[in-house]
């Protein structure tokens, strides 16, 4: 078992890796330790009532981490873990990956190349009373949209000379993206942040 520290300038937690050599297929089991809650968020307390636990990161993804650990315990209990080749990777920066990726993802990439079979243990879903396993994950891409307009008095907006303005044009483009992709299976589009304009009413005095 190894704690892999990240450089201080990356401002990201390290990773916890556990490796066991054996024969047969090489398994990589992936989880992550971080969650989206800020340290000063009101939702910080871990509580356990019977077999129900609540707290930050329980479903994303302490539950999956627990599944990994107890699955390995079960395999050990029945005597089949002894000869298995397994690597468990608990990353510390899944929610916001450290940069550069050549450092933050180095060990995970190497483990992925080593493995014959890789399983991620993020929570799946329950639909219509049945449990579902996730057999694939979507990738993502990020874009920056920059729109410029002609500075003019608001009374001229929508005229041929002035146009709709940069903010209206940005909204039109974003809505066009939304109209194009909504309904496509597995495809989503989200405008994360938007900023525009300077002041509502400018007084030269």
What are these regions (language model features)?
Residues 2, 27-29, 89, 117-119, ...:
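Hydrophobic/aromatic beta-strand patches that form the interior of the parallel beta-sheet core
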Residues 15, 85, 116, 140-144, ...:
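Broad gene-expression machinery/nucleic-acid interaction feature
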Residues 61-136, 196-201:
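Acidic/histidine-rich catalytic neighborhood of metal-dependent amide-processing enzymes
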Residues 29, 48-99, 141-147, 156-180:
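Alpha-helical metal-binding/catalytic segments enriched in His/Glu/Asp
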Residues 1-56, 76-83:
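Acidic/His- and Gly-rich active-site-bordering loop/insert found
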Residues 4-6, 31-33, 91-93, 121-124, ...:
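Fold-independent oxyanion-binding glycine-rich loops
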Residues 135, 155-205:
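Acidic-enriched catalytic cores of C-N bond-cleaving enzymes acting on peptides and small amides
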Residues 109-172:
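Metal-dependent peptidase/peptidase-like ectodomains
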